[in-house]
Regions:
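Acidic, glycine-rich A-domain
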Residues: 1-137
């Protein structure tokens, strides 16, 4: 695919205030090619010396693209990217608001690595839970 978009919402050096504004301004952009984005994020985070590396994915939970990146192929690609990230010390956690995502999220991200949200308003709480789980105690 010639056009795979990747957006960084917060860098390591900026304050959360700026990132919150970008998060609030997010809009759907069509197509959800999750696997390549996860591989890119994994590569970027693998270059850091951070003790913990976490990728938070906000998705409709349906990997798809115009070139048949969907169904079993898309799900398997995302699963492979998640497993590869974990092997490199990068943790992936997904958030989806679409009710139908319940069918795909467990297959792609694995048990305990996703939140299925009923409404966008519940995202801040779910984000906090996911980050807190990475920092027990």
């Amino acid at each position: 695919r010639l056009d795979c978009r990747f957006e960084i919402l917060k860098t390591f050096t900026e304050e959360w205030t700026d990132a919150r504004h970008r998060l609030a301004d997010l809009q759907p952009r069509g197509y959800t090619r999750i696997g390549p984005a996860l591989r890119h994020a994994t590569e970027l985070l693998s270059r850091t010396d951070a003790r913990r590396r976490l990728v938070l994915v906000l998705t409709d939970g349906k990997p798809n693209d115009y070139d048949r990146y969907e169904g079993r192929h898309g799900i398997a690609d995302v699963r492979r990217a998640v497993l590869d990230a974990e092997a490199r010390g990068v943790h992936i956690h997904a958030f989806a608001i679409d009710h139908d995502a319940r069918f795909h999220l467990p297959q792609m991200f694995g048990r305990g690595r996703f939140h299925l949200l009923r409404h966008p308003r519940s995202l801040p709480r779910a984000l906090g839970e996911a980050v807190a789980a990475m920092h027990p105690g």
